[in-house]
Curated annotation (Swiss-Prot):
Domain of life: Eukaryota
Protein name, UniProt field: T-complex protein 1 subunit beta
Family: Belongs to the TCP-1 chaperonin family.
Keyword Ribosomal protein carried by entry: no
UniProt main location, coarse: cytoplasm
Annotated EC: 3.6.1.-
Keywords of this entry: ATP-binding, Chaperone, Cytoplasm, Hydrolase, Magnesium, Metal-binding, Nucleotide-binding
Self-association state and partner proteins as the record states: Component of the chaperonin-containing T-complex (TRiC), a hexadecamer composed of two identical back-to-back stacked rings enclosing a protein folding chamber. Each ring is made up of eight different subunits: TCP1/CCT1, CCT2, CCT3, CCT4, CCT5, CCT6A/CCT6, CCT7, CCT8. Interacts with PACRG. Interacts with FLCN. Interacts with DLEC1. Interacts with SVEP1.
Catalysed reactions listed for this entry: ATP + H2O = ADP + phosphate + H(+)
Sites where the protein binds Mg(2+): D35
Top class in the EC scheme: hydrolase
Amino acid sequence: AGADEERAETARLSSFIGAIAIGDLVKVQDDEVGDGTTSVTVLAAELLRLGGSLADSYLDEGFLLDKKQLIYNYPEQLFGAAGVMAIEHADFAGVERLALVTGGEIASTFDHPELVKGATQQILDEAERQVLLSAAEAAEVILRVDNIIK
């Protein structure tokens, strides 16, 4: 059992070092291109590099987790409150069978966006506003972490 644990720890450390190396490559790309599209990956690499020292700072893990949840789960929470289920990365045949069994409807803009029911411009505007607010929250977190890193 000890040898297995040692191999698992070696594999974990190798992947950690690999992630940092990829982060370094991305940082070079971000410096050269400068368009900001790789900035989040650079941030993630720096957080990996910091390791445990981040836990000792005033910016605790719960704060980051709460903001991540705010960004990624907020639209899902809105759908849930409205009784709508969002399925991501599902095979379409499976979704069709699920809709048939549950009596639900599929809202997809892939083939015929004009057939999607229920979305008014007001709802779409509110959704866009909420996404922008979530993005502002994310930017705030990135700026705060950036201040710690420098």
